[in-house]
Amino acid sequence: MTDAPAHTRERVTISEVARVAGVSKATVSRYIGGDRQLLAEATAKRLEEVIERLGYRPNQMARGLKRGQTRLIGMLVADILNPYSVAVMHGVETACRQHGYSLVVCNTNRDDEQERHHLVALQSYNVEGLIVNTLGHHPGELLNLQRDIPMVLVDRQLPELNVDLVGLDNADAVEQALDHLQAQGYRDILAVSEPLDGTSSRLERVQAFGASISRRPGMRQQVLEIGAGLQGQLASFLAHSGHGPQAIFTFNGVATLAVTRALLEAGRNLVADVGLIALDDLDWYPLVGKGITALAQPTERIGVAAFESLLGRLRGDSGAARRIDFKANLIIRGSTQPQ
């Protein structure tokens, strides 16, 4: 007669282990709780053999709840399909794993009701800390959660929350882009963003763009948000080319994809008709023409820094909220090499 498949067996309990080993449940708890050195060597050896024979696996969640520690970190993201979010998440998860934590990711899909639902769920999971990269349309719920657990923001500032923020030095990234475009001879620059929607990082880029252009005599600027009329708006920009060589500066990967698709559908040549520089560096950029010039964000480092900041708070750091900004890295490709 064969043993029942693992998925149909009843879970072995701590009481069964204690009964078979001939010890108390408290003794078993000491053994699995890391206090083996408090037990007699013979008792510890017997427990090791019984646990192995019965296939006992401690319920880590229950043990964590009893100690007030679940070793779970929550992460709330606005769009799990966004390459930036995926890359940052990878950095967070790597750092979590290195420190013995597990990551619970909740994707709001840019839906306010989903965000509210996930905030409730994360509380029920008893996460020890929370990393937030979302639109933050429920600041009240986030504020209530912050009173109970440490929280760190990624990329987007929420003024209602006095917590650490980890992201990009947006002003420096914009300055690098415009320095490069100006040096390449471009004079008429169109900035393209996803809808601003109160998102602090997008607003910072738009503000830095306008301020930097105003300090550069002979350069002209426009800003537009991607939407249904993008192809027509790009055509209008390109039709008024009397101010000098034209370039487009996209503020993230989503905007870059929308602009590249619109230009290709309109039969435009990236280098001959218009230059293109992108904030974010995605895998497909080198594959378009002679490659798209990009400002790469150190997304992995941003994710790691977000977790490390949260870990510091979990360990008792009660200092003032900090902003940790990383510099972008300019990668020059063919899309900003006028012929």
UniProtKB/Swiss-Prot annotation:
- Induction context: Negatively autoregulates its own synthesis by binding to a specific operator site within the ptxS upstream region.
Q: Any inhibitors or activators noted? A: 2-ketogluconate acts as a molecular effector and causes dissociation of PtxS from its target promoter.
What cystine linkages occur within this chain? none
Spell out the Pfam families in the cross-references. LacI, Peripla_BP_1
Q: Which SUPFAM superfamilies match?
A: lambda repressor-like DNA-binding domains, Periplasmic binding protein-like I
UniProt keyword Magnesium, yes or no: no
- All residue ranges annotated as the HTH lacI-type domain in the record: 12-67
**From the UniProt annotation, which stretches of this protein bind DNA?**
14-33
Q: Cellular component terms, GO, for this chain's entry?
A: protein-DNA complex
Q: Name one GO molecular function term.
A: DNA-binding transcription repressor activity
> SMART domains, from UniProt?
HTH_LACI (SM00354)
Which keywords describe this protein according to UniProt?
DNA-binding, Repressor, Transcription, Transcription regulation
Subunit arrangement? Answer: Homodimer in solution.
The record's comment about this protein's domains reads: Contains an N-terminal helix-turn-helix DNA-binding domain and a C-terminal domain that binds the effector.
- Function summary: Negatively regulates glucose metabolism by binding directly to the promoter region of the kgu and gad operons. It also negatively regulates its own synthesis.
This chain's protein is named HTH-type transcriptional regulator PtxS
State the organism named in the record.
Answer: Pseudomonas putida (strain ATCC 47054 / DSM 6125 / CFBP 8728 / NCIMB 11950 / KT2440)
